[in-house]
Curated annotation (Swiss-Prot):
<dbReference type="GO" id="GO:0000162">
    <property type="term" value="P:L-tryptophan biosynthetic process"/>
</dbReference>
<feature type="active site" description="Proton donor">
    <location>
        <position position="131"/>
    </location>
</feature>
<keyword id="KW-0963">Cytoplasm</keyword>
<protein>
    <recommendedName>
        <fullName>1-(5-phosphoribosyl)-5-[(5-phosphoribosylamino)methylideneamino] imidazole-4-carboxamide isomerase</fullName>
        <ecNumber>5.3.1.16</ecNumber>
    </recommendedName>
</protein>
<dbReference type="GO" id="GO:0003949">
    <property type="term" value="F:1-(5-phosphoribosyl)-5-[(5-phosphoribosylamino)methylideneamino]imidazole-4-carboxamide isomerase activity"/>
</dbReference>
<comment type="similarity">
    <text>Belongs to the HisA/HisF family.</text>
</comment>
<dbReference type="InterPro" id="IPR023016">
    <property type="entry name" value="Isoase_HisA-like_bact"/>
</dbReference>
<dbReference type="GO" id="GO:0005737">
    <property type="term" value="C:cytoplasm"/>
</dbReference>
<keyword id="KW-0028">Amino-acid biosynthesis</keyword>
<feature type="active site" description="Proton acceptor">
    <location>
        <position position="8"/>
    </location>
</feature>
<dbReference type="InterPro" id="IPR011060">
    <property type="entry name" value="RibuloseP-bd_barrel"/>
</dbReference>
<dbReference type="InterPro" id="IPR006062">
    <property type="entry name" value="His_biosynth"/>
</dbReference>
<dbReference type="InterPro" id="IPR044524">
    <property type="entry name" value="Isoase_HisA-like"/>
</dbReference>
<dbReference type="InterPro" id="IPR013785">
    <property type="entry name" value="Aldolase_TIM"/>
</dbReference>
<keyword id="KW-0413">Isomerase</keyword>
<dbReference type="GO" id="GO:0000105">
    <property type="term" value="P:L-histidine biosynthetic process"/>
</dbReference>
<keyword id="KW-0368">Histidine biosynthesis</keyword>
C-alpha cells in the first residue's frame, strides 16, 4: 500500500477545504512546489494533486505549478480537477508527463470518453475519482449531487475496465475524524477495484487500518498539515513493510 500525500491547489496556493466547501478553506502555503519537495525529502514516491479551480470551473488553472513540481521533483504525480476532455488529458500525460490523471465529472457524465481514454493510455494511467455525498456520486468539484448510487456507479466502472478508483466520502473530507472504512470495506467486498482511501484521515492508526485491509493506497492531506501525522516516519515504516504501489 502506498501513502500518498496531497496538495490541493487554488489560485496558485496550497489549500484544504472542509467537507468540500469552497467557502471553508485554509491556506497552508503560497508555494506548493516547496511542499512537494519536502514530501519527496521525507520519502514520498507519489503525489496527489487536485486543481480545485479546475474542478469547479472545468478548466485547468494551476498548470504551471503542476509543471514546476513535475520538472523539479522525481515524484510520480497523479492529478485531478477539471479534466473533462482529451486535450487536457494529453496535456497532462504527454506534455507535462504526469504518471496518471484522475477523472471525476467526465467519468460520471461521459462513459464512452472514459472507455476511449482507457484504450488510448492504458489502465494504469487513467484513475477515476468517485466522490460520494449521502450515498450518491457528486461531480463538478463536489458542487453537484447526481442521482447515481455510488455502488452501482463503481460496478459500472468495473465493467468498463477501470482498475483503480480514489473514493472520497465528502462528509469526512477535511474533518480529521477518520475515513469511512465501512464504505471502503463494502466496495472491496462488492468489486475487485483497487481502492485508494481518501478523506478524513486523522492519524497513523488510519494508515495502519488501510494497510491491514490491503487497500491499494491512502491519501493524506490535512492530517499532515495540522501536525497529526509524521509522514517521514510513516514512509519509513511503509518501506520496511514493503507496500509498493504498482
Amino acid at each position: 500500500m502506498e501513502i500518498i500525500p496531497a496538495i490541493d491547489l487554488q489560485n496558485g496556493e496550497a489549500v484544504r477545504l472542509y467537507k468540500g466547501d469552497y467557502d471553508k478553506k485554509t491556506v497552508y502555503s503560497k508555494n506548493p512546489l516547496e511542499i512537494a519537495q519536502k514530501f519527496e525529502q521525507m520519502g514520498a514516491k507519489y503525489l496527489h494533486l487536485v486543481d480545485l479551480d479546475g474542478a469547479k470551473l472545468g478548466q485547468t488553472r494551476n498548470l504551471e505549478i503542476v509543471r514546476k513540481i513535475k520538472d523539479q521533483t522525481n515524484l510520480k504525480i497523479e492529478i485531478g480537477g477539471g479534466i473533462r476532455n482529451l486535450d487536457t488529458v494529453s496535456l497532462y500525460l504527454e506534455q507535462i508527463g504526469v504518471e496518471r490523471v484522475i477523472l471525476g465529472t467526465a467519468a460520471a457524465e461521459k462513459p464512452d470518453f472514459l472507455k476511449e481514454l482507457l484504450v488510448k493510455y492504458g489502465l494504469s494511467r487513467i484513475v477515476v475519482g468517485v466522490d460520494i455525498r449521502e450515498g450518491f456520486v457528486s461531480t463538478s468539484g463536489w458542487l453537484e449531487k447526481t442521482t447515481l448510487p455510488y455502488l452501482s456507479f463503481l460496478k459500472d466502472l468495473e465493467k468498463i475496465g477501470v482498475k483503480t478508483v480514489i473514493v472520497t466520502d465528502i462528509s469526512k473530507d477535511g474533518t480529521l475524524t477518520g475515513p469511512n472504512f465501512e464504505l471502503y470495506d463494502e466496495i472491496s467486498k462488492e468489486t475487485s477495484l483497487d481502492v485508494i482511501v481518501s478523506g478524513g484521515v486523522k492519524d497513523s492508526s488510519d494508515i495502519q487500518r488501510a494497510a491491514d485491509s490491503d487497500f491499494y493506497g491512502i491519501i493524506v492531506g490535512k492530517a499532515y498539515y495540522e501536525g497529526k501525522i509524521n509522514l517521514e516516519k510513516e514512509f519509513n515504516h511503509a518501506n520496511k513493510k514493503n507496500y509498493p504501489l504498482s
